[in-house]
Amino acid sequence: MVEAFCATWKLTNSQNFDEYMKALGVGFATRQVGNVTKPTVIISQEGDKVVIRTLSTFKNTEISFQLGEEFDETTADDRNCKSVVSLDGDKLVHIQKWDGKETNFVREIKDGKMVMTLTFGDVVAVRHYEKA
């Protein structure tokens, strides 16, 4: 099922992302850059691993993981997290935990586009991607 996500995706639209980053404790300067950056996300499957590469003018990140298995992740804003990504039906659910906190991203395909819903506490942001 992860195959549905395997593509190159370009961010087209973002709602409430600044509030989400603020809730995470991301500094003002980094938030300003994050708000104007339109990253390209490349999701692929390499053997039994899923690889998510995020490319932007601000920072490039790459994570490689097996579905359902915890892994160490350093985020674009330099948080060191314990993360797990799993499939929940047709959704790709990514949970990050650090310093007693937790955030999650839910990626789903709607009308050929990828919609990513980011939740931290009661703050929700939505980012829309189209195939590049």
UniProtKB/Swiss-Prot annotation:
It holds the Pfam family Lipocalin. GO terms for cellular component: cytosol; nucleus. A fatty acid binds at residues 127-129. Keywords: Acetylation, Cytoplasm, Lipid-binding, Transport. CDD domains: FABP7. The keyword Glycoprotein does not apply. GO terms for molecular function: fatty acid binding; lipid binding. B-FABP could be involved in the transport of a so far unknown hydrophobic ligand with potential morphogenic activity during CNS development. It is required for the establishment of the radial glial fiber system in developing brain, a system that is necessary for the migration of immature neurons to establish cortical layers. Forms a beta-barrel structure that accommodates the hydrophobic ligand in its interior. PANTHER family: FATTY ACID BINDING PROTEIN. Belongs to the calycin superfamily. Fatty-acid binding protein (FABP) family. This is Fatty acid-binding protein, brain.
